[in-house]
Amino acid sequence: MDQQQNFQPLAESFYQVPTLELAKNLLGCILVKQTEEGTSSGVIVETEAYLGNTDRAAHGYGNRRTKRTEILYSKPGYAYVHLIHNHRLINVVSSMEGDPESVLIRAVEPFSGIDEMLMRRPVKKFQNLTSGPGKLTQAMGIYMEDYGHFMLAPPLFISEGKSPASVKTGSRIGIDNTGEAKDYPYRFWVDGNPFVSR
């Protein structure tokens, strides 16, 4: 159901926790994007943690520092938007300044602005609207221009939601060429939610 709500960004202190903790805490929170068409939001139902320097699956592995990854070295709470196979993905920078860690938002459950989401991403099956990291950015109007936005203010931020009743943990998806890192249990999802990517 499309719902109207006065969303307020989470405080900066919310992001100032270890990355694995943040990945779990984000479940149930509401991702919000304001555009000219209106405000779209979704309840975060799936995340993945990437632990920077020591995590072969992370863009900051080995302290790689490029123009693309520079924002990962900022303080927590910034948006790291990047392209993979022409799909935009949104991560929340985590840990502490100088430590290139982040949390990927893998899936959300549509909450408000659903008509606008369907205009951006027409789907036959509603469940496919935001059930993956590239799907949710397309549906919500999250673009490369959002890279480096500090998520404590509009147009892109995260708002308080409700803690899920049950959370599952498992290995991350789509990182088969990263050695033992592919088996790390750094993916978190809301048990039983139909918008989880798999």
Curated annotation (Swiss-Prot):
Keywords tagged on the record: DNA damage, DNA repair, Hydrolase
Keyword field contains DNA repair: yes
GO biological process: base-excision repair
Protein name in UniProt: Putative 3-methyladenine DNA glycosylase
Enzyme class: hydrolase
Disulfide bonds: none
Molecular function via GO: alkylbase DNA N-glycosylase activity; DNA binding
Organism of this sequence: Oceanobacillus iheyensis (strain DSM 14371 / CIP 107618 / JCM 11309 / KCTC 3954 / HTE831)
EC number: 3.2.2.-
UniProt cross-references to Gene3D superfamilies, sorted A to Z: Methylpurine-DNA glycosylase (MPG)
Alphabetical list of InterPro entries matching this protein: Formyl_transferase-like_C_sf (IPR011034), MPG (IPR003180), MPG_sf (IPR036995)
Record-stated family: Belongs to the DNA glycosylase MPG family.
